[in-house]
Design a protein with these regions (language model features):
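Phosphate/nucleotide-binding beta-alpha loop and adjacent structural elements of enzyme active sites
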Residues: 1-160
Length: 160
């Protein structure tokens, strides 16, 4: 447990110091999607976003640029470590560890590494892409409507 905590602290320090999170970049998304989002929402000040499968608050993030522009929102990801990063780097957002589904309950989660964008709840996809080399665990799942209703943003218009 102590080793896991030290590892998380070390990674968080590296993200802050090496990536200089607070120095703005032109784009954080993988292929500039955040720039397109910014163009389409440019006239909206203090907007609200919901990022399902958020994964990382900076690296390949479609919402980091919005956050830096004053928007706030909800970041949802299955991975506990992802949420630790969001809580550290985006404290003004609501960050929720959950799978989004068409029902409330539990769902199987298939993964090779604890922290990967390739982890999935789709067994067929996991078998095909992980060559049957993956682990499984049950995680909480919830409908997006029920999840949003539990936050301070209930009934708020989603801008992105």
């Amino acid at each position: 447990m102590l080793i896991k905590l030290k590892s998380k602290i070390h990674i968080l320090q590296n993200i802050y110091l090496k990536n200089k999170y607070f120095l703005k970049k032109k784009s954080y998304a993988m292929d500039g999607e955040d720039l397109a989002i910014n163009r389409h929402t440019n006239n909206i000040k203090n907007g609200f976003y919901v990022d399902i499968g958020a994964h990382h608050p900076v690296h390949r993030s479609n919402t980091c640029l919005l956050y830096q522009s004053g928007w706030r929102g909800i970041n949802i990801d299955i991975n506990e470590f992802s949420l630790d990063l969001f809580n550290y780097l985006r404290p003004d957002d609501i960050n929720i560890q959950r799978a989004v589904s068409n029902y409330n309950g539990e769902i199987e989660f298939y993964f090779q590494k604890d922290f990967s964008q390739l982890n999935t709840t789709d067994l067929y996809w996991a078998k095909e892409n992980f060559n049957n080399n993956f682990q499984t665990k049950k995680v909480k799942c919830q409908t997006i409507n029920d999840l949003l209703d539990e936050t301070k943003y209930k009934n708020k218009k989603i801008n992105f």
